[in-house]
């Protein structure tokens, strides 16, 4: 079995890990192990005990939540995490239960630092709590932006904005101006992510397609004109 260190080139493409000092980054990898998930396999559910810190190095993980009784539960897809995203830091900080569900959307490989290991190491090296806090505060900023958009922007702008964010890796990549052309996401997933109906999602995507900004295919959205898509967000 390959050691976690083989995925260092992937992790180094992420802004947070790339800017960690060596005396934090190297012990993290030394404490890590690889975790492989099949499509649809659940990593953890809301209410589960903390299990550590994770980084996606292959595949993708959806972070979601549900409300209501089982027979009428409503689901919300918060985000789809792809390489080189890290997650799980909240429970490292407060030692409390998981706040949402995490599930692989395709065959996935994770770098996993078990909870007890990272807790003990940070207690012995408290100066590095600040580095981990930067991972959490960056996500908090993004969450505030998403809340503002949900309250103020109409659905077409919200959808375009989310596509731009996904194309740019939610700002997590190290390379300035880096983006990707194809976003692997279904219309159903996109509608759950934005809390709009599947029909509305389809109508907005068709409009963007007619303006030659995107091309919609089964399970993916191809960005044809990123600058034009940014213009829709304004």
Locate each region found by the language model.
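Hydrophobic residues on short alpha-helical segments
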Residues: 160-164
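A generic structural signal for short hydrophobic patches within well-formed alpha-helices
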Residues: 25, 118-119, 229
